[in-house]
Amino acid sequence: MSDGDYDYLIKFLALGDSGVGKTSVLYQYTDGKFNSKFITTVGIDFREKRVVYRANGPDGAVGRGQRIHLQLWDTAGQERFRSLTTAFFRDAMGFLLLFDLTNEQSFLNVRNWISQLQMHAYCENPDIVLCGNKSDLEDQRAVKEEEARELAEKYGIPYFETSAANGTNISHAIEMLLDLIMKRMERCVDKSWIPEGVVRSNGHTSADQLSEEKEKGLCGC
């Protein structure tokens, strides 16, 4: 796809404590590479990737491909950047929430991150995929898979164990998040409505319509 040759621009935000591997996960997804020497993100950064999304119909048939330009925003996890990070929550349509499988505190802080999303995202029930990262470091694991899955089930969100080092489940997690977003859009009664964080290739957004649809409860917020 050439520049501008897409149906939708969709913004995802990666968030979680500092050091959980947000930058490495996004870099693995967009470039297929792992860099163990990344420095801690300061403020906000982003990466981009073009994909084709094909929805399955009720009869299992694959629908027409939607050309998607993904913007994957990488946020600083440190407390001193928290106000800057939350300012970007409303501009994103989906959230990749990461914790470090070798760091129990980063897992315990997942609840705080979800609370922040519920307060600052485009609605109280945004689309989130939870990722326990660094699954390749099994001998250093501090969080049991059952614990993480139980927490994800409590919030009704998908859970994946990922590794930026070898790429395990990273594409699956982001594809799942994209699928949740596209299905949310399909559920909208007014098909001309596109949520914040989603831009048509003509550059038009619909922030005003978002508030109206949220009040009507049309899109599952």
Curated annotation (Swiss-Prot):
Gene3D superfamilies: P-loop containing nucleotide triphosphate hydrolases (3.40.50.300)
E.C. no: 3.6.5.2
UniProt subcellular location: Membrane; Melanosome; Late endosome; Lysosome
Inhibition and activation profile: Regulated by guanine nucleotide exchange factors (GEFs) which promote the exchange of bound GDP for free GTP, GTPase activating proteins (GAPs) which increase the GTP hydrolysis activity, and GDP dissociation inhibitors which inhibit the dissociation of the nucleotide from the GTPase. Activated by GEFs such as DENND10.
UniProt key word Cell inner membrane: no
Motif Effector region: where in chain: 38-46
Domain of life of the organism encoding this protein: Eukaryota
Gene Ontology biological-process entries: antigen processing and presentation; blood coagulation; complement-dependent cytotoxicity; cytotoxic T cell degranulation; exosomal secretion; melanocyte differentiation; melanosome transport; multivesicular body organization
A Pfam family hit: Ras
Disulfide bonds: C123-C188
Cysteine methyl ester PTM sites in chain numbering: C221
SMART domains: RAB, RAN, RAS, RHO
Modified residues annotated as N-acetylserine in this record: S2
PROSITE patterns, A to Z: RAB
Lipid-bearing positions (S-geranylgeranyl cysteine): C219, C221
Keyword Hydrolase (UniProt): yes
Phosphoserine carried by residues: S2
Keywords annotated in UniProt: Acetylation, Disulfide bond, Endosome, Exocytosis, GTP-binding, Hydrolase, Lipoprotein, Lysosome, Membrane, Methylation, Nucleotide-binding, Phosphoprotein, Prenylation
PANTHER family in the record: LD44762P
Oligomer and partners: Binds SYTL1, SYTL2, SLAC2B, MYRIP, SYTL3, SYTL4, SYTL5 and MLPH. Interacts with UNC13D. Interacts with RPH3A and RPH3A. Does not interact with the BLOC-3 complex (heterodimer of HPS1 and HPS4). Interacts (GDP-bound form preferentially) with DENND10.
Protein name: Ras-related protein Rab-27A
Source species: Mus musculus (Mouse)
Gene from which this protein is expressed: Rab27a
